[in-house]
């Protein structure tokens, strides 16, 4: 959480780096030790490499943030282009991480169908972050029934 996409703020890549050194890397996808970083941030593409370097295994971004952000691929990068969620998934994979896409409860799930060729994780938060900086636990609703019906699996 960066204080822009959502009003709350939380820790970033430096803290992930410190924690990663105390946790064994997973031996399988989604296995014990997987660092699933759910990025509730305004510029999700900017931070992919930093979180990869920090030890992130699964980089989950919000669809809504991606479509309204620039395509800059580093914190100091500049771009006038908008981020394509489908291209962001490919970029995350090219950096050696699994990709996840989250959508807000108010976003129609249909926006995901064109993106989900090879998803690693799909989730829909059933609550939004609290603007009062209260701790909000996010639970997820399994939306994979739709993609599995469309794409098999």
Say what each PLM segment does.
Residues 1-41, 50-53, 62, 71-74:
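An active-site metal/cofactor-coordinating segment within enzyme catalytic domains
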Residues 26-31, 46-153:
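Conserved anion-binding
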